[in-house]
Amino acid sequence: MKMETDRLLIRHMNEAYEAAFVRGIADPSLRTAYGFPAEMDETVPPQIFHHFLGLENAFALTEKGRGEMIGFLLDTDPELPEDVQAGLPENGHTLAFAVFPSCQRQGFMQEALQAYIPYLFRNGGAGYIHCGHFTDNVPSREMLHKLEFREYSRHALKNRTIVDEIHF
């Protein structure tokens, strides 16, 4: 899949993005927001990148003006607790995402999701879309609410609380 917005190219992640990805997740604040350990051995970011490469729908977000990866978007099957999953329609998608710290607060992720979400409903037959964020990740919560996601449930993960936001 190739998708384009006013400022972004959204492309399947490939080996060419590895260096930018490793640089991008070097910031401990991003690691914490995403649930990675704030301190990690230098061998871990490449391992995370290669794990993402193994996913069917792992996308690199590239700013057109820079031509460099500024973040990522992952589209996976939902991994929600059974009691939460039971009340939802079939064919759900979970989106996980991050914009690297040097490019945050510029609307890039909102722009990417505004393009990708309608695509999932129109072409992917999505019954719903799920995004989770930690309770202390206020920017993600505010952005998701602008995109008409609503809090559906909460559950514990890695000694923190995840808020499950759903878009129908």
Predicted segments with their positions:
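Acyl-donor (CoA/ACP) binding surface of acyl/acetyltransferases
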Residues: M1-A33, A58, T62-F168
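Short loop/turn motifs at secondary-structure junctions and domain boundaries
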Residues: H50-L55
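Conserved GNAT-fold acetyl-CoA-binding loop/helix
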Residues: L30-F49
